[in-house]
Structures are given as C-alpha cells and as structure tokens.
C-alpha cells in the first residue's frame, strides 16, 4: 500500500502566535479520482481555510466573518448533497441488479492529514464520499451495468466538481486578503498567514475567476 503526506505542516509553519486544536488522521483513499483530488488540492485548501480564518479575525468585522463562513459552508454542503444523491441513485442501481460486492483496489493510498478547522474536516469528508461513489461506479462498470464511456464521464465529472470547489475556496482566501489590504492590515496578515502558491493551473484559474467574479 502506498503512503502519501498531505497537510502535515506544524502550527509553527503557519503562525507562531497561537496554539490551535488539531486532529491528526490517516485518510485511506482507494480510487484514482479521489487520490487525484487529494494530491492536487487538499493541502492547498487546508492552508486556504486556515488563512481565511486568521485573516477574518484580523479584519475583525463579525458580519464579514459570518458572511464568508456561510458562503464556504453553502458551497461545501451543495457538493456533499449532490454526492449523496448520486450515491443513493447508484446504490439503487446495484440493488436492482443484485450486486452486493465491491471491488478491492490494487494501489490504495494513505494520507496523513491535519484537521484544524470544521471546514477542513468537511472537505476531507467530501473526499471520502467521492471515494465511496467512485467505488460504486467501478462496481457497476465491472458488472457491465455501466459502459466504459458512462464510467469515464461519471468519474471525470465528480473529480472536477471537487477540483472546482477547491479553486473557489482558494478564491475566497484571495478576496479576504484584498479586503485586509484595503483596511491597512496587509502586513499583519502577511505575518500571521503567509500566502501559499497554487501550483495546479486548473485550480489557480478557478480561484482567479472566483476572485474576479466577487470583486466585480
């Protein structure tokens, strides 16, 4: 079994000012699509969610804090609900076809992750849900209920849903930094929550689009 690391930086990597609660967990991911989402986005999203929280506390305007937290929750909840609906539909398809066994995977990965906010926990849970859904898709494909094209379309669609969500969360972080800059708190924010680079072009483009949409 392969092992990988994600979001394992210590609190001193991010901020030396506060001692924050954190859970360390090992997240096992079977499917290729969930592994891609994990490796492309989890650490960067975790850093963004941490930074958003720090930046909003520095800005110190409760209405803005509540508004941003609500936007993030709504976006995560929408993807979660859609994953649940798709999972229920495909579970019914398995039941209708008398399928009650799931395949194993040849190369599952384990990721050591830090859960340092409720939103990070929710994003990790989305990846678990994605992994479960991909397992059902693969089961139906192996049993010839789904065609290869249907499998490819479904796996790509759901992988991209989470990748785009990651980009939107990073875009919200960028908007929070712009807001802090407009309030003269850029230096304080830079010290407490240094900005991380987004190496994945697709995620970076989605983040940029989110920032532009909200700034307009």
Predicted regions and their residues:
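Short hydrophobic alpha-helical segments that form membrane-spanning helices or hydrophobic packing faces
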Residues: 150-155
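Polar/charged low-complexity regulatory segments
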Residues: 1-126, 132, 139, 156-216
């Amino acid at each position: 079994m392969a092992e990988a690391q994600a979001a394992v930086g210590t609190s001193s990597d991010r901020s030396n000012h506060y001692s924050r609660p954190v859970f360390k967990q090992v997240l096992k991911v079977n499917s290729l699509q969930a592994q891609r989402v994990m490796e492309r986005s989890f650490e960067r999203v975790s850093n963004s969610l941490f930074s958003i929280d720090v930046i909003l506390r520095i800005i110190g305007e409760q209405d803005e804090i509540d508004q941003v937290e609500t936007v993030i929750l709504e976006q995560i909840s929408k993807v979660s609900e859609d994953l649940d609906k798709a999972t229920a539909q495909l579970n019914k398809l398995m039941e209708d076809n008398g399928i009650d066994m799931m395949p194993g995977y040849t190369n599952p990965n384990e990721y050591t992750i830090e859960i340092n906010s409720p939103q990070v926990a929710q994003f990790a849970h989305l990846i678990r849900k994605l992994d479960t859904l991909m397992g059902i898709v693969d089961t139906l494909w192996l049993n010839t209920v789904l065609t290869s094209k249907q499998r490819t379309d479904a796996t790509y669609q759901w992988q991209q849903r989470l990748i785009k969500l990651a980009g939107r969360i990073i875009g919200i972080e960028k908007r929070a930094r712009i807001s802090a800059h407009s309030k003269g708190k850029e230096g304080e924010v830079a010290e407490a929550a240094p900005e991380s680079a987004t190496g994945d072009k697709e995620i970076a483009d989605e983040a940029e689009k989110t920032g532009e949409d909200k700034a307009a």
